[in-house]
Amino acid sequence: MLHFVASVICLNQMESCDSVNVLSMEKKMESKLIVVAIGGNSLIEDPKHVSVDAQYEAARKTAAHIAHLIKEGHRVVIVHGNGPQVGFILLRAEYSSDILHPVPLDSCVADTQGAIGYQLQMALRNEMGKIGCQREVVTVVTQVEVSPNDPSFQKPTKPIGSFMTKEDAEKKVRDHGWAVVEDAGRGYRRVVPSPKPIDIVELETVRSLLEHGEIVIAAGGGGIPVRRDADGLLHGLEAVVDKDYAAALMAKRLNADMFVISTAVPEVCLNYGKPNQKQLSSMTLAEAAQYTAEGQFAPGSMLPKVNAMADFVKSTGNLGIITDPENLYDAVYHGRGTRMIL
């Protein structure tokens, strides 16, 4: 398991980007709070590049696009996925089960928050430095409260780990009792319980950091799933919270001006992967509901992204965008991606 110690941050000294060292009142008024959700698969470019070095390089490429948003003076909260990375930890635990103790899922999520948070922190600092921008970046180990009675504990749906062939998936079912599903036509993946988030334990910590000008990485992997008992004490649960739902909850509670989900495609598509595939530049809440009812969006893939975005837009009336990492800046400034509106 990975262990890390959070560094102590001096909150009374805020560094701002060199190019906007003294922000004018007009610029401050233009500054927006943007919550950006990054998929765990966005941090792994392909099955042949899964080493730690390769994951950092993928994180660097994504961070480069976010850095340009930060340089414009925006406040940013980053929520990252961890599906493949949690799968790697569980696979290591499986291979070493004869000599080491098992690793519960909540601890796996905590491990990935540290490891991926570290990669993103370093990448963001480096990429901001390249463009003359200096801001503090901090990762918050984040617990997310869920209900122990959530129906997902009886019916696992959340894909984690790497993609498998049908033969490999069937072997995991036979040998280890895994629940597996075919994921968006790209292969088979293990599925685990994915309860809906109902509260973010460290929300006020995130809010305080934002008020002091920090760039915050929080609720990584959807947050560490915990339940609260009758005495108000927290307990970890064997589950993985969907990072899109956790990010939407974060964006709502912070009243973010904009919620952006970064995924593998530049725009949401109808008839995805078919000859009549159609890209959407915009989508209303009514259209999102219609397309969902038609089965246009795959569960465990685009469906939770559309649902999470619709929840945010309906609750706040603010702008939601779904796009890929390469188009993050252009999505905010030049209308790229799929924009969800009321």
Regions found by a protein language model. Name each.
Residues 26-342:
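C-terminal catalytic "cap/lid" subdomain
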